[in-house]
């Protein structure tokens, strides 16, 4: 199983790149984790936000692998504690399909992305900046993997 993070935005601050890459390099070879970035639409005073969301959504869905399980990152999604996420990761592995996790831009995800999702995951009831979500998702998935592999990274 391959994990794919599909995220809106291509110019992240150095701390985001550094944090994300730190966890990305830790993933085992039998569970590759990759980042696919789609460009954010131009937002200005007269921007058509609905159209921007639609376009970003189209690009995100086009970037996912055919047949991939799509999981959105969204506030109203299912909150998982770390052991629950580890169990979820195991179920995804048993399913045999690759998993694409979608992170929207400043206004969130398009209705098409939400409709295509088999699952929706809520990291927090807080509104989080989408660059930070990249790092949190990578760390959370690495921690979940460490539980399933009996790796000492996670401590109860």
Swiss-Prot record:
GO-annotated molecular function: rRNA (pseudouridine-N3-)-methyltransferase activity
EC number per UniProt: 2.1.1.177
Catalysis performed (reactions): pseudouridine(1915) in 23S rRNA + S-adenosyl-L-methionine = N(3)-methylpseudouridine(1915) in 23S rRNA + S-adenosyl-L-homocysteine + H(+)
Entry keywords, A to Z: Cytoplasm, Methyltransferase, rRNA processing, S-adenosyl-L-methionine, Transferase
Subcellular location: Cytoplasm
Pfam families for the chain: SPOUT_MTase
UniProt xrefs under CDD domains: RlmH-like
GO CC field: cytoplasm
Record-linked InterPro entries: Alpha/beta_knot_MTases, RlmH-like, tRNA_m1G_MTases_N
Binding site for S-adenosyl-L-methionine: 73, 104, 123-128
Signal peptide region: none
Known function: Specifically methylates the pseudouridine at position 1915 (m3Psi1915) in 23S rRNA.
HAMAP family listed in its UniProt record: 23SrRNA_methyltr_H (MF_00658)
Entry similarity comment: Belongs to the RNA methyltransferase RlmH family.
Assembly notes: Homodimer.
Name the UniProt record assigns to this protein: Ribosomal RNA large subunit methyltransferase H
């Amino acid at each position: 199983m391959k994990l794919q993070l599909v995220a809106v935005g291509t110019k992240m601050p150095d701390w985001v790149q550094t944090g994300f890459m730190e966890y990305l390099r830790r993933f085992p070879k039998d569970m590759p984790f990759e980042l696919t970035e789609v460009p954010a639409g131009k937002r200005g005073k007269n921007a058509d936000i609905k159209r921007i969301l639609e376009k970003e959504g189209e690009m995100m869905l086009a970037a996912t692998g055919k047949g991939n399980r799509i999981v959105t990152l969204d506030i109203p999604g299912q909150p998982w504690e770390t052991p629950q996420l580890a169990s979820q990761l195991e179920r995804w592995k048993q399913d045999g399909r690759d998993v694409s996790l979608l992170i929207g831009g400043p206004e969130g995800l398009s209705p098409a992305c939400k409709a295509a999702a088999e699952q929706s995951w809520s990291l927090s009831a807080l509104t989080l900046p989408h660059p930070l979500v990249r790092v949190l998702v990578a760390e959370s998935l690495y921690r979940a993997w460490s539980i399933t592999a009996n790796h000492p990274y996670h401590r109860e």
